[in-house]
Swiss-Prot record:
It comes from Paenibacillus polymyxa. The keyword Ubl conjugation does not apply. It comes from the Bacteria. Transmembrane segments: none annotated. Stable from pH 3.0-9.0, inactivated at pH 10.0. Its main location: secreted. The keyword Zinc does not apply. Bacteriocin with antibacterial activity against C.jejuni. This is Bacteriocin SRCAM 37. Belongs to the bacteriocin class IIA/YGNGV family.
Length: 30
């Protein structure tokens, strides 16, 4: 998606990736 200018878009997408990785790695196995 596009959010603000190119740099802002990259930062937002990177933040979503980091949040997704945290959720993936720190979700306990059930």
């Amino acid at each position: 998606f596009v959010y603000g200018n190119g740099v802002t878009s990259i930062l937002v997408q990177a933040q979503f990736l980091v949040n997704g990785q945290r959720r993936f790695f720190y979700t306990p196995d059930k």
